[in-house]
Amino acid sequence: MTNTTQKSCKRLFLHIGTHKTGSTALQTLLAKNDRLLVDNNILFPNSGRISTCSGHHNIAWELNGDPRFTKENGTISELCLELAASDCNLAIISSEDFEYLHQKPDQLYFLKTALENVGYEIDVIVFFRDQARYAYSLYQELVKHGLDRTFYSFSKEVFRTGAFVMNGNWRFCFSYEVIIQTFAKVFGSNHVHCEAYSNPIHIQFLLVCGLSEISLELSDNTSNKALPLEKIVALLRINEFTKGMSEQDASKVRNAIFSSQIPEHPNLSCTLNNPVFIILHYVRFRPTRTWIRTHYNTKITITIIKDITSSIKCSPIFLWKRRRRHIIDSLVYEAFDVLKNDVESQK
């Protein structure tokens, strides 16, 4: 009697963010537990990770034509070789920068084909948060990366186009159904898992993957935290001044602000909340939230009354009467002193 076994496809979860939904914390957790994951028949590949505890950003950058891509951090070909050589039946690839590929479906088809050719069936996991909170958090993050536009200018573009574009190919889509529809067309609607963001993200992520029974070793809080309002304003000034600088020098100046110590204001720790913007986001993107709820039974909520009440209490206009403006000035001067000292040391 001859026994015949049919080789089944392995499964791969492709986590695509989106940005500002706990992706950094999730990737750090998975990377630090990669040996434990292998022991449970799960691979979190090394290829494409730009550091020991990062996600697979280099793969997303390769597909998106991002100048940050370097072959030394692993290519799609090397990722596929690692996946093919693994005995694990399940793999996880994660980068919020895969989100950008909703505007490049050909690259998604290329990725899908490459992964299928080494024996994997792909499921896409994407997290969303309500657009008002997303806007506040994303704006602060982009200021860290050199954005010099006001929050009003940023929001105006979001309301007008449903997206915000920076550095040419960083496209942050607020009309979430556009992202979902592109990935669903490539990977199949039944293979796209759309989730509403809640913190901590790893519990929900493992549940979607069917891995809720796995107990990962939690590390220190590695989330990408928002900056105090003073630092955001200081960075806006810096970004305007450093437009003509090389990215390396501009980054040194920004990093000086990141590391600066400023007095704590525990009762005034707000971001850029404003009741008007919350209402505008609610109305502008209500069709998006309705579409997601209808097609994926996922509810992205925004608690209007609660958010507006807290926003009024800590709006920037209200805060400026209380905060000391010299904190911002000192941050700017300190940042430029770092660059000045660096230049003088190289003479």
Protein language model features and the residues they cover:
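Anion-recognition interface
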Residues: 2-347
